[in-house]
Amino acid sequence: MAKLFRNYNTLVEYEADTNKPVNTICFIKDAKVIYVDGIQYSYKQLDYLSPAISEAEALEYMGKIIKNAQEVGLIYVKPVPTIYWTGDSNTISINYNDYTAESDSIIIDGVEYYQLKLDKDLDNDFYLFTNNTFTNLIFKDVDTSKVTDMHEMFYNCSALNSLNLSGFNTSNVTDMHYMFTNCSAITSLDLSGFNTSNVTNMMFMFGGCVALTSLDLSGWDTSNVTNMTVMFHNCNALTSLDVSGFNTSNVTNMMAMFYNCKALTSLDLSGWDISKVTDMDSMFGRCNALKTIRMVGCSQTTIDKIKAQLSSNGITGCTIVTE
């Protein structure tokens, strides 16, 4: 919880009756109330306080801010706060130097917060939820239209079992590498609404999603992607995967792309062009259950490359379907 509130000069009065760790904070501007761990308190705007409480003085904030061993009843906020998540478990942090806010809301675990307005000029969103222990994230009216970098956004969210990103605007995103890596509890992802037309890097994007049984990537435009290294590495619960819509004409690296997808029995690579791929090492390594690969509309060169990889990876009994 260290650094939970920092670098603010605009203060509000906060009347707390506990001294426990704060896990969730919700500000509702018009109602002039604040919810801390589901408990409602009122607040009012205070004038600038000089000297302001420093970060060091607020370091041990646990529901109240303590200054010189005395409770001062103040927290650092601004009238319209923006909320984002730190790497601490179940911690919500507020930092006005990094993000801007709008007046709409975001719903996290059924709790309504102010909208996250994520600005491309302000460090983007990589690492945003990294290493958190949330089990469910539901976004409502989250503005991601300016974001260009989402790499490692949900990295190592090992408890996350539900994630709805249907409202995400990814039209300006160029980097999604490691975005969902090690989300080991999630079983289903529908990312069909993602606009990936500007993405160039998808390396290890779903690596370590060991519980994933359903993955919808239909409608993806991957025409600018160059790196698909270990993209589905260790997705060992997937039984089928349709990536026939992928435009792979600019991809140069597919090393270990499906490595250890040990439950995978069918794969649709129809329409793929891998003429620029220079590294396919271990592309199907340990995919020993693979029985069918659809390659409708693929050139003979592409088909031969895939067959060569299957052979070098020790995959036998897999049928290539071309019509």
Could you tell me what each predicted segment is?
Residues 25-47, 66:
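Short, surface-exposed terminal/edge motifs of secreted or surface/virion proteins that either
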Residues 2, 17-31:
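Extracellular repetitive beta-rich solenoid segments
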Residues 1-17:
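Short, intrinsically disordered N-terminal pre-domain segments
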